[in-house]
Structure formats: structure tokens, C-alpha cells
């Protein structure tokens, strides 16, 4: 009877271990879909600068500056998690849609020069903006910028703008 008990114990122990393995947490997924953006942002996340662990929301909440230029970035999803962002430089990429930053109210400096941007409406509510570089894009309409009352520097050369009158409402330029 004692021998039988010992024989059963290892088997039941092995079953318990199998159950434990099934309950393991799923591996964290990066908040970024665009690998070039993730690699660029990684340089600004001190704890993960030299490893390949996925960047998760907790890594990004205190980031104030991101600069990733000429990296072939297309998709900005994930940047919406960077709530403390004050300076964003993504010049020289392949960006056409930058809706991901539309709620980042602390941004003061934004460089999106040399991209494929046509619609600037995502920045209409970013009232802390003081500097915008949008040269060498495909921007046509400046109306979304007219309420950015803190704007001090606005660069728009080499775009498709017909009407500059919304920029005239920016009194600090």
C-alpha cells in the first residue's frame, strides 16, 4: 500500500505541473505594429534599450522625446500610449496617417517633414504645439491649424497649399 502511494504521487505531481504551465501568462505584445517605429522608440526606453523585449504601455507613459528619422516608418499606432510626449521628430519617413497622435495634448514640437501627409486634421486639437515642421509633404488645407494659438514656428514649404489664410490667424507666428 505504501509502495502504491509512492507510485501515484509522482504521476499526480506531473499532472499538477502540466496545469501550471497551461495557466502561464501570455507573452506581452509590443504596442507598435511598425517594427521600424518600435526600434526607434526603443532607443528612448532606457530599461529596454539593449534587449528585444516588446515595448509595452508601461514603458512609454513617461517618454517625453522621440526622434526616429529616415527609418521607413508607415504606421504610427502605439504612439497614442506616449501620453507625456512633448517632442516628436519623425521626419523622412513614409507616414501618411498620423491619427495616433491626435490626443497627445502635451506635444509642443512636431517634425513630420518629408513624409506623405495630406490631412493635418489630427493636430487640430494639439493646442500646446509651438513648432510644426511639415515641409515636403502633400498638405493642401491649413484650416485644421487655425486654432493652434501657441504656434510660434510653422514650416510648410513644398506642399500643395492653395489658401494660406488659416495661418494668418496664428498671432504668435
Predicted regions and their residues:
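N-terminal capping/linker segments that flank leucine-rich repeat
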Residues: 2-89, 94, 99-100, 105-109, ...
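Consensus positions within tandem repeat domains that build extended binding/scaffold surfaces
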Residues: 111, 133-136, 155-158
Amino acid at each position: 500500500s505504501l509502495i502504491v502511494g509512492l507510485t501515484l504521487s509522482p504521476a499526480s505531481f506531473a499532472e499538477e505541473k502540466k496545469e501550471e504551465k497551461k495557466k502561464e501568462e501570455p507573452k506581452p505584445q509590443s504596442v507598435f505594429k511598425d517594427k521600424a517605429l518600435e526600434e526607434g522608440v526603443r532607443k528612448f526606453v532606457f530599461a529596454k534599450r539593449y534587449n528585444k523585449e516588446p515595448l509595452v504601455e508601461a514603458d512609454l507613459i513617461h517618454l517625453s522625446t522621440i526622434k526616429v528619422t529616415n527609418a521607413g516608418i508607415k504606421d504610427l499606432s502605439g504612439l497614442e500610449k506616449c501620453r507625456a510626449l512633448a517632442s516628436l521628430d519623425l521626419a523622412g519617413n513614409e507616414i501618411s496617417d498620423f491619427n495616433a497622435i491626435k490626443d497627445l495634448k502635451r506635444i509642443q514640437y512636431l517634425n513630420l517633414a518629408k513624409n506623405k501627409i495630406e490631412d493635418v486634421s489630427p493636430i487640430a486639437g494639439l493646442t500646446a504645439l509651438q513648432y510644426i515642421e511639415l515641409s515636403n509633404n502633400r498638405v493642401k488645407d491649413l484650416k485644421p491649424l487655425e486654432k493652434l494659438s501657441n504656434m510660434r514656428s510653422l514650416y510648410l514649404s513644398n506642399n500643395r497649399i492653395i489658401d494660406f489664410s488659416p495661418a494668418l490667424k496664428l498671432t504668435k507666428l
